Amino acid sequence: MELCDDTLLRELAKTKNGFTVEKIKEILLQLNNVFKKMHENKIVHRDIKLNNILIKYLNKEKTKFKVLLSDYGISNQINSLSKNLKTYAGTQIIMAPEILSNSKKYGDKCDLWSLGIIIFKLKTKKHPYSGRKDNEILDDIKEKGQSVLDVIKDDKLKDLLSKLLVINPDERISWDEYFNHPFFK
């Protein structure tokens, strides 16, 4: 494993109002290479969060960097017989609704939800939803819905988030749709 300089969470804490849209895009484009490999190998991370995204600076000015995803401890592979996972795993505040609700089965779209939460936090420095227990977080998600996106001013970023933060995983954007979203063009 490579030696990294910091986590994305600590870098975010150093900003006044969150990252610019351009910086978010730069980070995501690098992470997308990791996500594509995970998707191709049917790996679900289940704990994508800012503390698990590492930064390695490539110059002293910290203008060039490499982004890595860490902590695959609770990741799992979806096999061809069962396209779903069943284990309750992850960090509560970032967990997809289908995991929080103890749904009997969930798939790789749970990582897309977590990614939406992370992107929102990178832009605003805040979590879109709150609560200390699963049912409190779920209630907040249902109550606020996508109205939390009103603070996002960039149209393409807002559209991407509106497709990631969809309660019903069957209606949530797919990985292929995510990779091809206009935000990345």
Question: Where are these predicted regions, by residue range?
Answer:
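Conserved short submotifs of the Hanks-type protein kinase catalytic core
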Residues: E2-T7
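Catalytic-loop of the protein kinase fold
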Residues: H39-K56
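Conserved activation segment of eukaryotic-like protein kinases, specifically the C-terminal portion
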Residues: L85-I99
